Amino acid sequence: MKITKLTTYRLPPRWMFLKIETDEGVVGWGEPVIEGRARTVEAAVHELGEYLIGQDPARINDLWQVMYRGGFYRGGPILMSAIAGIDQALWDIKGKVLNAPVWQLMGGLVRDKIKAYSWVGGDRPAEVIAGIKTLRQIGFDTFKLNGCEELGIIDDSRKVDAAVNTVAQIREEFGSDIEFGLDFHGRVSAPMAKILIKELEPYRPLFIEEPVLAEQAEYYPRLAAQTHIPIAAGERMFSRFEFKRVLEAGGLAILQPDLSHAGGITECAKIAAMAEAYDVGLAPHCPLGPIALAACLHVDFISRNAVFQEQSMGIHYNQGAELLDFVKNKDDFKMEGGYFQPLMKPGLGVEIDEEQVVARSQGCADWRNPLWRHADGSVAEW
């Protein structure tokens, strides 16, 4: 079997799908994208495609090394996202050829189900509480929400009070009936993170995500030493070599590699195994589409240290398409009691509605994240 063609489709809300075709008619699907940089990743996919045409898709490990080491310059979000989507599609092909789900090819299940959590949007406490109530009606009891607005290096205590007030009202409304993580989104400096985390401790969040940017990872162990709240990060780390440094430094309780950003299934399975050796949990980052989610689930179901799985159903970014709009086998993604079950169909287990993908990709607008500024006019972290 030989690879014959790679086709990319930019889609709403901010996704990109990749179709890899073979000379025997077997097709694999992947989801290579950086939110807001889809065209750049698309160019990288087609550059890497030059290595792949005419090659055997079954040699996933070799093709991964060719894509990663074939160029003198490597790593980073663009290249690793391109590799990630290609890697997903190659695993999809392998599973279809062997008539087995990817988790089966990687050694089989370590669990029967995996807890899912849902994003909750809203800028005011009442909006967040209303969102949680709606999501509880469809079975969720675990959530993630933005922990705060953008903060300067040293900022107003009123912003800290506002963030704490939101969390306090959520805990008062729901008590211990729900769990929630708080995403600082890299918006907070180390000095402000120390203050904010301390103020949030009485409300027992499940975790604090990206308390500072990955570029400031040296603060993770320092912040962790000052709190009992688990610290999570990893969505902006792109290879096992970056994760190696934070694991060795300590401080993180949960790693959050993104299966569409960090080299795909092949790389993230290695990252998961590294994390297990350090007694660190795994919670793959996934605010993206169904192919990315399927890839995450296969890694979750082979990784003993997987703790829960993010998914984008109802997320505020999903303007123009919902999580399963391009999927035929929607029932396979149905959650029971807030848990995902293993995907049982061959490959990734996602049946893509190709006709709709082609139609919706025509004239798809480019998504860009907002550009925020502080009160003084300087650029803020979004």
Swiss-Prot record:
Disulfide bonds: none
Active-site positions on this chain: H185 (proton donor), H285 (proton acceptor)
Pfam families: MR_MLE_C (PF13378), MR_MLE_N (PF02746)
Residues that coordinate or bind Mg(2+): D183, E209, E235
Gene Ontology BP terms: amino acid catabolic process; D-galactonate catabolic process
One MF annotation (Gene Ontology) recorded for this entry: magnesium ion binding
Cofactor note: Binds 1 Mg(2+) ion per subunit.
Enzyme type, top EC level: lyase
Record's function text: Catalyzes the dehydration of D-galactonate to 2-keto-3-deoxy-D-galactonate.
UniProt miscellaneous comment: Reaction proceeds via an anti dehydration.
Protein name in UniProt: D-galactonate dehydratase
Organism: Cronobacter sakazakii (strain ATCC BAA-894)
